[in-house]
């Protein structure tokens, strides 16, 4: 934004290539039930993280079930707080004016298989939330959502306010 906002400058940036990576999940809850989000993790994965974002004033708790069936119950943790279990949860209100909620979950040496996140909104206006996995190049092995959403997969810096974000496609490979 700083460069693009200068006099007689136009910044054009790439939007990234994550639409087909299966690294974004969009969910919506009616406030009465949890939304199950399945993540497939490959063998011998050293670790990864995911970010769950909900727009203010939504407040969300997350329960996690491992591939072996162990369930860590949902905890609705307000404000800026931190919980450490077998993996790490960080709940934070983010943004100077909006106060959007970020739930940052880091998995260290996770078991291979399907992990299920149960997203449980405690305060619901729209019930909408997004979850992102890291970009493809930042993961050593394949970690994907089983029901991904290919929309809202812009990468930084294309998510800035001022620059023009452009996408491209290799017409030979279709990517």
Predicted regions and their residues:
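Loop-rich non-cytosolic ectodomains and luminal regions
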Residues: 1-175
């Amino acid at each position: 934004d700083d460069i693009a906002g200068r006099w007689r400058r136009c910044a054009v940036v790439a939007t990234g290539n994550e639409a087909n990576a299966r690294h974004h999940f969009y969910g919506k809850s009616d406030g009465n039930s949890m939304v199950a989000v399945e993540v497939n993790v490959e063998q011998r994965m050293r670790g990864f993280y995911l970010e769950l974002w909900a727009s203010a004033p939504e407040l969300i708790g997350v329960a996690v079930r491992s591939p072996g069936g162990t369930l860590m119950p949902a905890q609705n943790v307000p404000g800026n707080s931190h919980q450490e279990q077998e993996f790490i949860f960080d709940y934070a209100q983010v943004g100077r004016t909006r106060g959007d909620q970020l739930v940052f979950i880091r998995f260290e040496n996770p078991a291979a298989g399907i992990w299920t996140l149960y997203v449980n909104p405690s305060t619901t206006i729209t019930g909408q939330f997004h979850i992102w996995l890291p970009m493809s190049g930042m993961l050593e092995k394949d970690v994907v959502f089983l029901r991904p959403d290919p929309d809202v997969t812009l990468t930084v810096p294309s998510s800035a306010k001022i620059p023009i974000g452009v996408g491209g496609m290799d017409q030979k490979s279709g990517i």
